[in-house]
Amino acid sequence: MSHKIMAINAGSSSLKFQLLAMPQGEMICQGLIERIGMANARVTMKTSAQKWQETAPIADHRESVTLLLDKLLSHHIINTLQDIDGVGHRVAHGGEFFKDSARVTDETLAQIERLAELAPLHNPVNALGIHIFRQLLPSTPSVAVFDTAFHQTLDESAYIYPLPWRYYTELGIRRYGFHGTSHKYVSTALAERLGVPLSALRVICCHLGNGSSICAIKGGQSVNTSMGFTPQSGVMMGTRSGDIDPSILPWIAEREGKTPQQLNYLLNNESGLLGISGVSHDYRDVEQAADGGNRRAALALTLFAERIRATIGSYIMQMGGLDALIFTGGIGENSARARAAVCHNLHFLGLSIDEEKNLRNATFIQAENAVVKVAVINTNEELMIAQDVMRIALSDKVTFGVSA
């Protein structure tokens, strides 16, 4: 029996959605509502056969959800609201409380709101989206899918920071990790394509995009990840610095009089590829500038790859070897240059790539004699969310694979 499952990602001024037929994993309709709160909000929806786009005044998130449901009905994508069998919501932060996706109850929702202190920009609007869908679809089960949950298997030695102990016990400061839904999806997809249980593999997943994170997966579980207390830490990103000497911040504050908020903006919005290149946060623009002779752009590309390589090296040490390396995310899936730079001169690890396969974005791009598999796998967080809705909220408990 097929079920229609809605995957929702609510942002501060946007609502991204996908309606999927499950368990097949087929996209029925997907879209985005942008500029919520403005008179010229933009609504984009598409199916495999059609695409619709319009502007309309949308005052708030409730209006955006109401409009979305009305559009699904008016375009005959669904016949009634009861056709939607479940709703899955992406939630930024589950803290230590949520170690898996969870069916939404009043207590679940209250806990998500309490965790807003760890993700003040995201959890409140995620919770708002859940509230609205529960009100408009009161008989439809909903599931919260947490970006942090996959990393709750980290050992204490991997998540504790060397700060005074009370900062962990009293304030919850520790490594949480993010992109968990993506890391879980692509590692599961890799195991299926190899025909090997994920539990038997040592995998490093590189989710590379405007936000980037690396994850070490051993025995099917996350054992380390580069993002930490916030998504700012780890490798260099589009506009985020990643890891730097922390004493740089008070040094800058003293000399330039910057507030904590200004320092946070500097680290999150003015650094990374943009900060070094002076060109753009977009990897493609930086590539183009580097090819045109821009020295800082070329340096930015080198720094980007070297930070990733250093992280991969430390994770190989931790896991005692490597069976497969995965590239995913906007850069990981589309930039042959980035993949080649990360994998350069790693023959001593049994890791090398085939240039032709890499250039055509083949699923497996390792050289013929390479020991380590190197895969390019498009992430699909919406499908992972829909699968969790089926697993947790629907009584028939369908068993899934990941579509190849």
UniProtKB/Swiss-Prot annotation:
Listed EC numbers: 2.7.2.15
UniProt name for this protein: Propionate kinase
GO biological process: acetate metabolic process; propanediol catabolic process; propionate catabolic process
SUPFAM superfamilies: Actin-like ATPase domain
Gene giving rise to this polypeptide: pduW
InterPro entries linked: Ac/propionate_kinase, Aliphatic_acid_kin_short-chain, Aliphatic_acid_kinase_CS, ATPase_NBD, Propionate_kinase_PduW
Gene3D superfamilies: 3.30.420.40
Matching NCBIfam families: ackA (TIGR00016), PRK12397.1 (NF009063)
Lineage top rank: taxon: Bacteria
Protein family membership: Belongs to the acetokinase family. PduW subfamily.
Sorted UniProt keywords: ATP-binding, Cytoplasm, Kinase, Nucleotide-binding, Transferase
One GO CC term on file: cytoplasm
Function: Works with phosphate acetyltransferase (pta) to capture exogenous propionate and regenerate propionyl-CoA during degradation of 1,2-propanediol (1,2-PD).
PANTHER family with a match to the protein in the record: ACETATE KINASE, ACETATE KINASE-RELATED
Transmembrane portions of the chain: none
Protein source organism: Citrobacter koseri (strain ATCC BAA-895 / CDC 4225-83 / SGSC4696)
